[in-house]
Structures are given as structure tokens and as C-alpha cells.
């Protein structure tokens, strides 16, 4: 019985963790999904953003008590403006998706929503982590030796 409980807890922890991309695997995936150069943002900048927002983790979430919103997924897309989590007050849902779609191992919907975010006037500057860690920095290390 204890062995089954331990196995169940182990499987639960693996499920909650989600997919943590290897750096070059993510770079290739983002390129394949059309983010390289989208709205003038280099692939290296997208990689830097994903590193600092989620550490390449598809299941990353971060609650923001001030706005009572949550950031979701590999790009930490916010429920106040971009997705619907059913609990954020006055949510806009500009990407027209449930926030749970941003937590999937298949990041196709997360990339589509990130494209929507970066298409707004703030562009890539909409992400605080990008402004803090990537803006005006040499971000080439995030794609180095990835063949992209």
C-alpha cells in the first residue's frame, strides 16, 4: 500500500512539473513555430525571455496578488489580459484561449498567444523579465551552438 502511495506521489510530481525544454530543443521548436524574427524580435531574444520567465518550463505559474492575476506557461502570459483562467477579475482574454492551454507540453498555443502579445504596441517590452534581463544585452548565448 505504501509503495502504491509513493508511486502515485511520484507520478503526480512528474505531471505537475510539465516539460522543461532543453535549450536547443526549445530554440528549434520556436523557430519551427515562426517566432524567429517575428515582429522584428530575434530568436535569441525569445529564448532569453523564456529562460528568465519560466526557465523553459511549460507548467510554470506565478500569482500576482496586486492584480489578482496569474502568469502562465513558458512565456508567463498573464490572465488579466491574454487568457481566461475563470478566476481573474475583469480578464480581457485577448488570445481567446483558456489559460490551461498555455501550460501544455505542446507550446503551439503559447507561441500563438506570444505572437499576439508582441503584436501590441508594447511589443516584447510587455514582458518585465525581458526588460530586466535581455534588453540591451548580448543574448546570443541563448541560441549558441543550436544550429538555428
UniProtKB/Swiss-Prot annotation:
GO biological process: defense response to Gram-negative bacterium; defense response to Gram-positive bacterium; killing of cells of another organism
Keyword Signal appears in the UniProt entry: yes
Covalent S-S links between cysteines: 24-146, 48-134, 83-99, 95-113
Active site location: 53, 71
Catalyzed reactions per annotation: Hydrolysis of (1->4)-beta-linkages between N-acetylmuramic acid and N-acetyl-D-glucosamine residues in a peptidoglycan and between N-acetyl-D-glucosamine residues in chitodextrins
Signal peptide range: 1-18
Keyword set, alphabetical order: Antimicrobial, Bacteriolytic enzyme, Disulfide bond, Glycosidase, Hydrolase, Secreted, Signal
Pfam families: Lys
CDD domains per record: LYZ_C
EC numbers for this chain: 3.2.1.17
Biological role stated in the UniProt entry: Lysozymes have primarily a bacteriolytic function; those in tissues and body fluids are associated with the monocyte-macrophage system and enhance the activity of immunoagents.
Subunit structure: Monomer.
Remaining remarks: Lysozyme C is capable of both hydrolysis and transglycosylation; it also shows a slight esterase activity. It acts rapidly on both peptide-substituted and unsubstituted peptidoglycan, and slowly on chitin oligosaccharides.
Family membership noted in the UniProt record: Belongs to the glycosyl hydrolase 22 family.
Protein's recorded name: Lysozyme C
Organism of origin: Phoca vitulina (Harbor seal)
